[in-house]
Every structure is written in C-alpha cells, then in structure tokens.
Amino acid sequence: MIGVYLRSVIFPLLFVIQTICQPPGNVFHLGFLHCDVLENNVEGSTTYINYRTSASAASIAIDKIKREGLLLGYDFKFTILYDQCDENIAAGNAIKLFAEHNVDVLFGPTTNNAAMPVFILATYYNIPLITWGITSSATLDDESRFPTAGMLSIGSRSLAVTFREVMKEYGWDQFVFAYSLEMNDEKCETLRDDFQNMVAYYGDIVLSYAVQIMDHSEEGLLAILKDVSTRGRIIVPCFHEGNSRGLHRRWMLVAARNGFVNDEYVYIFPSLRSRGYAVPQADGTFRYPWTEATGPQPGDQEALLGFQKSIFIVDMQGQGNVGSNYTQFEHEIIQRMKEPPYNCTDACASPEYQTAATYAGQLHDSVYIYGVVMDQIMKTVPNQYKNGTAFPRKMAGVFNGVGGTVAIDEGGGLQPTLFVLTLDSNNNSSLIMTVDVDQQEAVVTKHYTNEATALWSHRKGIRPPDQPICGYTGSLCPANVFFQYIGWFIAAIIIIFFTIMGAILAFIYLCHAKQQEVERQNALWQIPFKSMMTVTKKGKGEHSMRSISSVPSTISSTRSSTLSEVGETRNYLFFQIQNDVEMERVAAKKHSIRMVFDNKTCATMRQMRLIDHANLNKFIGMSLDAPQLYSVWRFCSRGSLADVIRKASMQMDGFFIYSLMKDIINGLTWIHESSHEFHGMLTSKNCLLNDRWQLKITDFGLRIFRTHDQYNKSDRLWTSPELLRTDDILGSREGDIYSFGIISAELITRSSVFDLENRKEDAEEIIYMLKKGGLQSPRPSLEHDESIEINPALLHLVRDCWTERPSERPDIKQVASQLRSMNTNRNDNLMDHVFNVLESYASTLEDEVAERMKELVEEKKKSDVLLYRMLPRQVADKLKLGQTVEPETFDIVTLFFSDVVSFTTLAGKCTPLQVVNLLNGLYTIFDGIIEQHDVYKVETIGDGYFVASGVPRRNGNEHTRNIASMSINFVKSLADFSIPHLPGEKIKIRVGFHCGSVVAGVVGLTMPRYCLFGDAVNTASRMESNSKPGQIHLSEEANQMLMRLGGFTTEPRGEVIIKGKGVMATYWLLKMDESAAPKILKKKQD
C-alpha cells in the first residue's frame, strides 16, 4: 500500500515546477529526466544518481546564476519526468518533454541505456541536451552523430587515454584485460571497446589478451588468473560497481592465496564510479576495499596484500572530491529536498537518502553552465537560444563548478581530470598523478618526486616490468656463467665495493658541504636583534648636552638623518645594520605571529634573500629574537608612493607617471613569472621610491605571515572585488592587475586612493559597495590636471585593469606590451628626465638661493649678537659648534652684588611701567660701565645686579681690580642719575663683593643660562645685604687681594655678624688711585 501511495500521490511520473510567473517570453523551460530507485531498483542509483539525493542541485545552481547577475529579467520553469534508467521509458518521456512540454533544454538521462534513444531524439528535435551521472559510453561522445549534446559525465574513452598515459609513464608496452558483464552492466563492455579502440588508434601499446569472466566464484576467478598470467603481468580487471563490489576483494584474495601477488604483477582498476580505496556506503561513510561491508572478516589482510600491488584510475573531481565548499553543498541538497517545490519529506527520510548523490555536483554544474552560456546567447544572438546544434560549441570554456574547475571542450564535452591512486607504505591512499584529458590528448601531472618510494614501496622500490625477465617460459634467460668467470666477478665486486664506498664518502661529504652552505645562508637571513641599531631623535626626554650634569649623548653617531625623521609607524620600525661595507638603513615590518621555521620556510627565506631585481625591494632577512617577529627590508629614502602623492612634493608630468607605472609592471612581471605567482597585497603604500626615484615593490613573497597580520579597512581599498567577497587575504594574479589599476589612478590624479579626503563615503562603505558589485560598483576618478599630458590609451588600459570580471582583465604581459607601445621615441631613464626638469629651473633657483643666503647671513649676525649678549662668547661659540659645555671649577674669582636702597618704597610710588623705565635707565648706565671692565654680567633680578670677573675668562689676579674699579664707578654714576617722574628722589645702592672659588656651567634647554655655584656666591651676596647705602662692602679675602694689587684705599669696618657665616672681619672700599685703574678698559669679552 505504501508503494502504491507513493507512486500515485507523492511521486507521479510527471509534475511541473514553475518558480515565479513571468511573461512567457522571459521564462526558460528546463526539462529533467531522473532515475528514481523506488520505481525501478536500478543497482547503484541510490549512491550515484538518485533523484531523492540530487534533484535540488538544480535549484542551488539557479540561485547561483541569480547571485552572479546572469539572465537578469528571466525566470526558470522545471518539468521533471522519470526514465527509471530504462531506454523505453526514457524515449517516451523525452518525446513528451520535447513535443508536449516544449522544453528549451533537457538535463539527462544519467545512464548509458537510457541515454541512447534520448540523444537521437534531441538531435531530431534540435534541442540542447546536457547529460550527467554515469553515462560513460564513448558512442555518446560522437559529435557528428549527436551535435546537440553536451556531456558533463566522463566517458570511458577518457579512462582508456589515462590508462595509456600510465603505461607509457612506467615503460609498459602490453597488458591483459579481464572483464565481467554481471548485472547486464554495459560499463565493462564499453570499457573493453574503448581500450581496443585506444590500442588501435595509438599503436604504441598492445592488448595481449582480453577475456570475459563468466564464473565469479573463487574457482572461476582462479582459472581466469591462471589464464591471464601466461599472457601478461599488467592485469586490468573490470567489475560491476553496484552491490557486487565485493568482486574486487574476492579477486585480490584469490590472487594473494594462489601466488599471483608478488613483485611481478600489477593490477590496475579503471573506474568512473569509484573513489579508489574509499568505498562509499549508503550512509555516507567509506570503507576499505579489502574489507567487507559487514565488518572485519578472515582474509582481510590477505586481500590487503593484493591491493598493495594495485593502482586505481578514478574520477575524483566529478564526484565532488575537489573543492572546500562541497560538504556544505551536499548538506544543502538534502535540506532543500524537503522544501518546496520538491517537498520530499517522508519519502526522503530513510537513512540511505541522507547523503547527497555522488554525481549531484555534475547536475549543479550542468544547470549553472547552461545559465552562463544562455546569458551570453541572450546578449548576442537571442534568437538562437533554442538552437541545439549551436549550443555545445558555446559551452567551451572554463567554469567554476561546485566541486572545482570545470573545463569544456569545443564539442561540449567535459575535459576531465582523472586521478591515479595507489597505497603508500602505511596502506593509505596516495595520489601519484593526475591526467587532464582533452579528446585523444592528455597532460600528465606527477605528484611525487621519488618513484621508488611513492609507487613501489611494497615492491622494494623496484618498478616491475610488463613481462617476466626470463619470459613466460623462462627461455629468455641465458645459462649461468657465474662460475665460469668467478675471478672476474670477484674483481668486479671489489671494484664496485670501493666505487660504492667512494661514492658514499663523496655523497656524505657533499651532504655535509650542502648542510654547511644551508647553515651559512640561514645565518645570512637570520638577523640578531642586538645588531639592529635603533635610530633615535632628540626629544623632550633627553638630557641637555649643556647642563652642568651633561654626559655624552645617547644618540648614535651613525644615525641617518633621513631615518631619524621617519620614526616608528604602525607597521614598521627603522634600524641600521652593518653589512659587508657600511651601515645599511633598513625597515623592519612587524608581524603578529610567532612560529617555528621549518626546513620549507627556511628554504623560502633563502630564496627570498637571493632575489635581486631593479624594481623589487631587497629582502634582508628576519629577526627571530626580537620582541616580536620582524621581516627586514632595505630602506627607501623617499618613502612610499602614497607618501609622495600625499605630500605633493614632486611635480609629476606624463613621463614621470609613465615611468613609475612601468617600474610597477616590471616588478610584477618578475613576481608573476616566479614561483611566488602573485603579490596579493599590492598598494601604493608598498611601492617605495629610493633616492634615484626608482620604484621598488616591497612586502612580497612572505605569504605565510599575511593571514596573521592586521590590516586596516583602508588597506583593502586596493583589493579586487572578487577577493573582497571571499575574504581572500592571499590574492591572485588578476587581483594584482586590479591593484595596479587603482595605483595608476592615484598617480594620474595625484590624489589618495579613491580620493578619500574628498568623498562622502569612508573606506568601509566603499569596500561594501565593491563587494556588492554591479553597475554602480565604485572606481576611482581619472580626471587629471589638463597641464599634464596623458596618453588616452593609458586611461583605457587603467580601466581595463580594474574591470569587474577577473577573466576580462589583461594579464601582466599584455599590460607591459601596451605600456611599451605608449612610449615611442622617448628616453626610458627617469633620472635623466628628472635632471632635465631640474636644469630648467637651475638659473632661477641660483638667484633665489643667493638672495636667501644673503638674508640668512644677516639673520645669523643678528642671532649671534643676541646670543653673545645672553651668554659668554666662548660658551656661545661652543654651543654653536654642538660641543658639550662641561661644568668648570674656577679657583679664584671676584663676585659682585648690588641692589637699590629702599627699592620697595620707591616702587610703591611708581606705576609698573615707571618701575620698568627706572630700572632700564639705571641698568643701561651700569651696562655701559661694565663694558669698560673685564667682567661678565651674570644676571639681574629685580633691583639686584650680579657681576663676576675672572669667569668664564681667566684674567690672573686682575678680577678683583676690575670689580673694585667697576664698583666705585657704579656709586659715582648715581650722583648724576635722576628719576624723571620723581625729581626729588635720589637713587642709592648697596654694594658688596667677595673673592673665592666657584663652579660655572650652562643650565637648562629653554633660555639656557650661564650660572655660578659655590659658597663664594653666598658670601658675596651677604656682603651686599650687610652693606650700607652708597657704601662698598668687601670681605677680608677681597681686601687682601686689593692690598696686594695696590692703589686702593680701604678701612676696616670691624667684625660683623654675617647670616650663615658667623662673625667676619669686613672692610669699606673708599677710593681708587688713577694709577690703579684696570689696564684692560673698553675690552669686549672674547
């Protein structure tokens, strides 16, 4: 009853799925022929092509077509019928689809039996047909007979071509073929015919024997093995791949138990429905072919010995084993079968329907490719959309299928990639080669470096021949001559022994030398952090070189002024390292990853350091012991291209822009043609300029760090839309071309990327619009200054580089060729061009420089005059030369202090401005007097006046004479001094001086002062504070100095209590003889 209900209600033979009602002219009618195991229990269809585990792949493909903006304005209508893998049902339902439902295209059938009549009918109705699944017959691949058919399934002819490539690769010329026609499966018969056709077509290998297996018991298989063993050693068994897959195990078990598994025999299993050594189960899991589905059995290990001598040729790509998104695709198929329009819930709930069909990906790719091709047809020749004869030729190309790249030839047939597998030494499936098949031709890609270990690990590393060494009867081996020539054999063995020993020793020496060379090269790129000298700048935190506690500068004597101006950035630090000749300036890029450098990574570092290209920045090495991981690159003094554009410090003409673009292309050409393949993160920030205006690309090759580095949103503005959508941080060649276009726009417009400063959108909004794509996808403006001559072809080239579709962008060779064609009859040397530009400004600049120099000299004179008034000349001269002014001790000097008597009372009678004018007039008189003496005015504080002699210029014992003479002149000068606003008031001063030792030095960075320190300063100040108005008070030491000099009259004051000193004997200076006047008068400090 359940079966009747399912047949009559849930799965009628015909139902129509119409997605969205659209006008008839805008709806494509898609027809499908599926095989449903409930109606006809076709063995294997559950695993490979069952409707319940594959049909929704078409809807997923339609979603992808719409996401990619294909066939805009069109909808799709589905009509699904079941052929039940039967040719009669298939023919009848095909006529219904073509004649009654008037479908525009037919997808299916999925088996060889059902396909033949449908192919004929599609040709008759001239309707496009795309088949998928397990249709493998080479007959269906006849373009002349079936011109309307495109095939995404792999034909057995591709297996035959791949098999021939395996035979040729390992030097085998002959093989035997044993096949079974169990379950009436045409697979092996078709394969036999294709093998025979392949042998006849090429003529370079021989099918020695072909035999059909009639008896599948162990006895029958043993008889076949004995038969074929007399005809060949390369044995190709072929069995049905449905529920009878146990024949593979039974065959190998019989071979192992009866002596047909040894180093002579090779068993090659060609299969399109197999995954090699992974046998799929109904629940989606896998088992090994040497085991039973029911679990471990006796004989599993014996069967394993047989499979160790085997090779599988399989279609892994067609079954979705290539591509990281395939697991999600399989899960989505099962989920969407439960949703409208399929609504397969109860009927699809069984465990065997919880895993997607093996070839569901082919159905998805068939519908998707139809959408891509039809989009092109509707844009070019819309009246040909239903022309079946023309359709297969339009399918030619490469498409991004759900399981990986799908290549279609000119006839609409799949260009498959077949996988050749064997068991490695650990009995794990190992891919040894892939074969890309195109019609009768093939391209072989080996996936091993050592054939002995990769293929023959179970054969002692020896490749087996295709026939016994001595022939099948042993007649090919000569008689044993060992004993006849035993002496020669012994001599040969000795020679060989010593030769081998010599070779071993030479090999050991070479290995040791190679290891030493590797270690030497590793030492070159491993840069110790302690050898990297940081370049510092003088700042607020540094001690003054002019203070009394000055110490030698901490600034490196080898620092570069250019480096010191750069400083640390978010991504870079700047250092100097010692190379073979001199200190070299470097930039260290910060990486936020810590990792162990294995041999492969070390080899990459060695290769990176050997790169020396005119337009690639030199990679110096890595600093592994730094606080964080640094990659070290040569420093380019002019900074990045982005910096040059932002600062607008260089006037760029058309040739200058062209030269920089050419440098970028030269660097990218090398990268694209090298093992690095592409840059991946090309921006104007990592296009650097050296002092010769030569552009060098940096930050290339170290892709291992890029996935862990931190990037701002603005750093992604140069990334192509397709990479932004996938969050691919590594990049591609096409992405580099896009980035080059964006950088070129910056150069042409001399503005930042996307002119962010003048746009209303920020970086994140622009990236969102780039990801979204479409007709409104933003691109930089190419409007440039009309004074700059830009070749219009250059603007077209830039627009081609940033086109939305990667496939439509020119490759690096095309870009380089077009750039060369734009620079005819011009010198390619940018430096010569820059020099020519500079020469045109030379005369004007010389005059301007001379004028500026004259102004500079005048300003310097004024500055020197001001400086000499603030500091002693000899001190100022040292500071101007950048020399350190060390604190200095003076054993004997004379120190003078004075202040105005009752200054506070006097100031109270004046306004602040009058006080300033009063002191300015008084000090102007005093300054004129000190100019006549060998003294130095230390400072004035309010009404206090501090003068010293004997410092900083030593003058023997004349310092006391100069201070005494100056003091007397100070007192005398006040007799004629009057206060303009207080004519009745008279100024009187108190004077005191003392002789003693002091320490002198420069203090401070801002307004530095030449200061004196010591007890003598305090004593001199006390002489002044204890003096009387109009009197000159001096200490006993000063009095003794005057008495030794002579010419001065003093009188004792007596003992006076001095604060901080106790009782001191002091004196008054009364007068000075003219003969005692200082000999050094009106002398400037020198």
UniProtKB/Swiss-Prot annotation:
Gene Ontology molecular function terms on file: ATP binding; GTP binding; guanylate cyclase activity; peptide receptor activity; protein kinase activity
Domain notes: The protein kinase domain is predicted to be catalytically inactive.
Superkingdom in the source lineage: Eukaryota
Keyword Transmembrane helix: yes
Domain Protein kinase: from-to ranges: 560-836
Record's keyword terms, sorted: ATP-binding, Cell membrane, cGMP biosynthesis, Chemotaxis, Glycoprotein, GTP-binding, Lyase, Membrane, Nucleotide-binding, Receptor, Signal, Transmembrane, Transmembrane helix
UniProt-recorded name of the protein: Receptor-type guanylate cyclase gcy-6
Functional summary from the UniProt entry: Guanylate cyclase involved in the production of the second messenger cGMP. Regulates chemotaxis responses toward the salt ion Mg(2+) and to a lesser extent toward Cl(1-) in ASE left (ASEL) sensory neuron.
GO cellular component, one term: plasma membrane
A GO biological-process term: positive regulation of calcium-mediated signaling
Transmembrane helix among keywords: yes
Localization (cell): Cell membrane
Family stated for the protein in its record: Belongs to the adenylyl cyclase class-4/guanylyl cyclase family.
Gene3D superfamilies: 3.40.50.2300, Nucleotide cyclase, Transferase(Phosphotransferase) domain 1
Segments on the Extracellular side according to the record's topology features: 22-487
Chain coiled-coil ranges: none
EC supergroup of this enzyme: lyase
Secretion signal span: 1-21
EC number(s) stated in the UniProt entry for this protein: 4.6.1.2
Natural source organism: Caenorhabditis elegans
Catalytic activity reported: GTP = 3',5'-cyclic GMP + diphosphate
Main location group: membrane
Mode of membrane association: Single-pass type I membrane protein
Pfam families in the record: ANF_receptor, Guanylate_cyc, HNOBA, PK_Tyr_Ser-Thr
